[in-house]
């Protein structure tokens, strides 16, 4: 750990916080006091605080000298003695709308604007906004929380633990909660206001509840409640460690910066990731199930056992990202959710970003406090990390993996660990050297491409770091599990190259074509060459869904790097034209089409050919499934229809255009009542056809009026299709009004509009002109990085690259943004170069298709 990040636990080790908060919603202020019991190692100790007023610091009723240090979000205390002691601190602070610390969430109920109060203390900086503490994950302690607030009739307060002494609350107005288990400060949470919910119990007696504002219908709680109960029961069986606390409450918040937060016993969510109403799509239900399962995995991996410092954040997130799929696959096997695991976790983004020179490794040290935020890189820590955990699980076997986890939880419960502690537990359970296997994957950035070819009857396998764009090859090597389907081949590729003789004999002795990385569980791609590729493509129809998806994903990445021509991908689409798997259609096929679209300019002959390709690819799905849902159809059919119709409407396929227009007219008086699975594409179609200011205003009004987060997202996307400057100016005029667009959702508007050629120039100029406002509104929000990353994922010509560099390069002094800016420049440059080299070939391939 570098010295630039001060570690306060080295001078004071807290054991218990007895915390009282008195919150005044109307004044947006709070006062409080905290008695912190702990061991002082030194006479000079430091505690974290951010934007707090420290009124007094007492030890045994005697005032202590202290010095404020706002620059380091701290204050420093002089103690007369060391050892175990209790410091009493009185303080006050303000409630802001930054969605960090203690903050309000706003919603509309019966036409009136209301608010609830809740907390967000992760990532590293936010518990200190609510009370003085050692705000570091290693500084675990127990918490006794008491709350008082300007309550209104019917208000409810929730926290990590059950309420105690409720009979006294009627006299004092103070809500008091049971002592928490030993845990990190970032996991403390509470929420209060006009809330309601439903509860159930697991077979082991844990009370599970789903809660939201009174604006949300009670029946929208049922789905998540059922999932939560069954997932907890699954994890208890799988880990062989009981859920450790009495309750598991899940609270949907109207305003929330992250997707969800694993506070122990009181998990908080964006409403879209917890609530499922009767008019919901299969895709949204599956998304809710995965998010709930992810947060519940953290109750063991992250809460019960916690990383010692943020550089081991991957221990939390990589594991939870994998276990969400393991658990949901176990409780809902009919969803075939594991077919989507190789891609659904943002793996395509991970494989793309991880191929850019300069990317971070999964495990990286933090050299500056502001860099802690950058550790939450979803493509690397979440998606790549989960892929590595899945690779490890397969390498060990599920039985040894689960056995090792049980030992890990039992040994380290209520304490902190580093990655090596997990490796030791898994090594003991399996008899394998996990550390030597995993270190190259966690400590090195990037990943390898394995080239496979046959030369003179010798199978040659070689590894090299895979890059997209300009790079410096440093000769990195990985311990690669080959996971081949043939006998007679090595298990692992450790060196740069291996040669296996007698290929023709091996082919005779084995069934099927040679495949590496079967089930696509390891974090590398394969470049099959010559006859090996020909064999796979000839046998493509006989491969399983995951293998088909993997082959197309790998060929696309090879095209992104320039190792093969992008134009060659056009012909590969023939292989999946009649496939009915949702994952093949929505992921492999969609990724190739999205890649090809970057080479196409609007209103050109090439666009005509591209749309013809799209219509051909999805016409079979439309003819098979139609426009309207059929009674008793599978979730997969619903999701395939949704994807196919979206593409066909994009490609102006008239039968779908007319059908969508008819649906809109039938629901014109209440567009929210359109079936959720097709509502988004119906709204898009209407905007494409009508393109009027009055429709823009209608959509904006519907956006403000609804409490359905999915509907809001669909309206945002539909609005981005307008090609009307007056309408665009009207939309941009709404973005800074928090009563219209919540700050947490601003990035969705930015992403949707910036990706459309008509709006791009205007929206890009708006973002640059309003950058300081965006920074002020979202500086504490985990979506702030998106305003650097989104244009990097969209821009595709030299003019935009030059503009991106001119605007962002001067901001690289901001450590929280530096890596994303430098990565963004490289990403756009690689795209510009690829399009320049391949544009003519792609246009020709589309014309000849």
From Swiss-Prot:
Disulfide bonds: none annotated. Its EC number is 3.4.11.2. GO terms for biological process: peptide catabolic process; proteolysis. It comes from Lactococcus lactis subsp. lactis (Streptococcus lactis). The record marks 382 as: Transition state stabilizer. Zn(2+) binds at residues 294, 298, 317. It holds the Pfam family Peptidase_M1_N. It comes from the Bacteria. GO terms for molecular function: alanyl aminopeptidase activity; metalloaminopeptidase activity; peptide binding; zinc ion binding. Keywords: Aminopeptidase, Cytoplasm, Hydrolase, Metal-binding, Metalloprotease, Protease, Zinc. Belongs to the peptidase M1 family. This is Aminopeptidase N. It is found in: Cytoplasm. Aminopeptidase with broad substrate specificity to several peptides. It has more affinity for oligopeptides than for dipeptides. It plays an essential role in the metabolism, it may be involved in nitrogen supply or protein turnover. Monomer. Substrate binds at residues 122, 259-263.
């Amino acid at each position: 750990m570098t010295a630039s990040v001060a570690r306060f636990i080295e001078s004071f080790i807290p054991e218990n916080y007895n915390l009282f908060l008195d919150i005044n919603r109307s004044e947006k202020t709070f006062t409080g006091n905290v008695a912190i019991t702990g061991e002082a190692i030194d006479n000079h100790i430091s505690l974290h605080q951010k934007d707090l007023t420290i009124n007094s610091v007492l030890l045994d009723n005697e005032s202590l000298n202290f010095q404020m240090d706002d620059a380091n979000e701290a204050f420093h205390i002089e103690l007369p003695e060391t050892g175990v002691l209790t410091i009493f601190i009185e303080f006050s602070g303000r409630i802001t709308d930054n969605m960090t610390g203690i903050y309000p969430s706003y919603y509309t109920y019966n036409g009136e604007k209301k608010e609830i109060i809740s907390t967000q203390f992760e990532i590293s900086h936010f518990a200190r906004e609510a009370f003085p503490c050692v705000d570091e994950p290693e500084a675990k302690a127990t918490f006794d929380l008491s709350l008082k607030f300007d309550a209104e009739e019917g208000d409810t307060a929730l926290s990590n633990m059950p309420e105690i002494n409720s009979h006294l609350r009627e006299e004092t107005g103070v809500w008091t909660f049971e002592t928490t288990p030993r845990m990190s400060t970032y996991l403390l949470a509470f929420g209060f206001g006009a809330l309601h919910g439903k509860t159930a119990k697991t077979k082991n007696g844990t009370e599970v509840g789903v809660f939201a504002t009174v604006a949300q219908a009670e029946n929208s709680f049922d789905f998540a409640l059922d999932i939560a109960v069954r997932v907890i029961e699954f994890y208890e069986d799988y880990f062989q460690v009981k859920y450790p606390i009495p309750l598991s409450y899940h609270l949907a918040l109207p305003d929330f910066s992250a997707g969800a937060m694993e506070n122990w016993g009181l998990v908080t969510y964006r409403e879209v990731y917890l609530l499922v109403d009767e008019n919901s799509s299969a895709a949204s239900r599956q998304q809710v199930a995965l998010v709930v399962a992810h947060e519940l995995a953290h109750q063991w991996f992250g809460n019960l056992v916690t990383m010692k410092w943020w550089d081991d954040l991957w221990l939390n997130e990589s594991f939870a990202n994998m276990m969400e799929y393991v658990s949901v696959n176990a409780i809902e096997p009919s969803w075939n959710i594991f077919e989507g695991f190789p891609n659904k976790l943002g793996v395509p983004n991970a494989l793309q970003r991880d191929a850019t020179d300069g990317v971070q490794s999964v495990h990286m040290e933090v050299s500056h406090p502001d860099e802690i935020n950058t550790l939450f890189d979803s493509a690397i820590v979440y998606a790549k990390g989960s892929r590595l955990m899945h690779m490890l699980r397969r390498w060990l076997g599920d039985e040894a993996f689960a056995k090792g986890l049980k030992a890990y939880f039992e040994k380290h419960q209520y304490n902190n660990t580093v990655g090596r502690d997990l490796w030791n537990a898994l090594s003991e359970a399996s008899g394998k050297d996990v550390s030597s296997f995993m270190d190259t994957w966690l400590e090195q950035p990037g990943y390898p491409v394995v080239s496979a070819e046959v030369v003179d009857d010798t199978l040659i396998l070689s590894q090299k770091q895979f890059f997209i764009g300009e790079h410096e090859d440093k000769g990195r090597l990985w311990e690669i599990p080959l996971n081949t389907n043939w006998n007679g081949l090595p298990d692992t590729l450790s060196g740069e190259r291996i040669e296996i003789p007698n290929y023709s004999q091996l082919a005779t002795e084995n069934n099927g074509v040679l495949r590496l990385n079967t089930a696509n569980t390891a974090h590398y791609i394969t470049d099959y060459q010559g006859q090996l590729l020909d064999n796979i493509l000839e046998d493509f129809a006989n491969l399983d869904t995951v293998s088909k998806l993997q082959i197309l994903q790998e060929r696309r990445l090879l095209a992104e790097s320039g190792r093969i021509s992008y134009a060659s991908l056009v012909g590969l689409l023939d292989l999946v034209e009649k496939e009915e798997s949702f994952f093949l259609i929505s992921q492999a096929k969609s990724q190739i089409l999205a890649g090809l679209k970057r080479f196409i300019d609007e209103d050109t002959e090439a666009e005509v050919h591209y749309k013809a390709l799209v219509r051909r690819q999805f016409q079979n799905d439309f003819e098979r499934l139609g426009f309207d849902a059929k009674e008793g159809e599978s979730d997969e059919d619903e999701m395939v229809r949704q994807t196919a119709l979206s593409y066909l409407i994009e490609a102006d396929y008239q039968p779908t255009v007319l059908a969508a227009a008819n649906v809109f007219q039938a629901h014109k008086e209440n567009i929210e009542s359109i079936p959720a699975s097709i509502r988004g594409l119906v709204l898009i179609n209407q905007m494409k056809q009508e393109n009027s200011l009055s429709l823009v205003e209608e959509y904006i009004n519907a956006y403000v009026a609804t409490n359905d987060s999915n509907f809001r997202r669909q309206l945002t996307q539909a609005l981005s299709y307008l090609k009307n400057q007056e309408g665009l100016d009207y939309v941009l005029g709404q973005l800074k009004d928090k009563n219209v667009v919540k700050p947490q959702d601003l990035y969705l508007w930015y992403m949707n509009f910036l990706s459309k050629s008509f709006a791009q120039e205007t929206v890009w100029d708006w973002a640059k002109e309003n950058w300081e406002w965006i920074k002020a509104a979202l500086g504490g929000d985990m979506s702030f990085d998106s305003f650097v990353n989104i244009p990097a994922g969209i821009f595709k010509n030299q003019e935009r690259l030059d503009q991106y560099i001119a605007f962002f390069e001067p901001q690289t002094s901001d450590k929280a943004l530096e890596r994303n800016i430098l990565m963004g420049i490289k990403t756009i440059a690689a795209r510009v170069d690829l399009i320049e080299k391949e544009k003519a070939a792609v246009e020709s391939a589309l014309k000849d298709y």
